[in-house]
Amino acid sequence: MPGGLLLGDVAPNFEANTTVGRIRFHDFLGDSWGILFSHPRDFTPVCTTELGRAAKLAPEFAKRNVKLIALSIDSVEDHLAWSKDINAYNCEEPTEKLPFPIIDDRNRELAILLGMLDPAEKDEKGMPGTARVVFVFGPDKKLKLSILYPATTGRNFDEILRVVISLQLTAEKRVATPVDWKDGDSVMVLPTIPEEEAKKLFPKGVFTKELPSGRKYLRYTPQP
């Protein structure tokens, strides 16, 4: 599909109608991190579980200065009515209020602009719906991460939170996070940092894994 964003691209400063009124995207983000995530349709089973989990994790994102905003091709009216079902799914009072807004993209303008349409999933009129896309933007409004899932597979919002924690850590410190890393685990020293500099940067210690190649590139340090 036309449109789409690449890592490092600045988010378009679009305007949109949402469940909390009309927004301009850059103003909504402010100086926060932001997650824009699309779902195929309101009142569907997988989407209900996804937004329910996002709502449960919203306080964890908020304390890390991350704003959430959802999007689909449904109307604001549908979003508000569906929010009651989402809250009921979470065993909470079935109100129209969620801890994040949902964008009304019934004309698919943003879905086309951002490359969010899934040509394999069509509505009753034969029009493509939105895929399960996740965009993570930094305070500089640049895209730091993108994830694209098909309609049939729900996303793991705990994994999205884990990735955001990694993105924020590695934006501040000269480290990388290894496979299956969790907050609090040891991290990896970037291979571009000379050994003597690494000792100064990481006073908790740098631990090198000995390898048959003799190359000292697997270097760990406790999470800064």
Swiss-Prot record:
Q: Which CDD domains match?
A: PRX_1cys (cd03016)
This chain belongs to the protein called Peroxiredoxin-6
Its annotated compartments are: Cytoplasm; Lysosome
What Gene Ontology biological process does one annotation of this record name?
A: lipid catabolic process
GO annotation, cellular component aspect = cytoplasm; cytosol; lysosome; mitochondrion
The residues responsible for catalysis, as annotated, are C47, D140
Q: Which organism is it from?
A: Pongo abelii
Q: What is its main location?
A: cytoplasm
Ranges for region Required and sufficient for targeting to lysosomes and lamellar bodies = 31-40
Residues where Phosphotyrosine is found: Y89
Q: Which residues carry this modification: N6-succinyllysine?
A: K209
Which positions bear Phosphothreonine? T44, T177
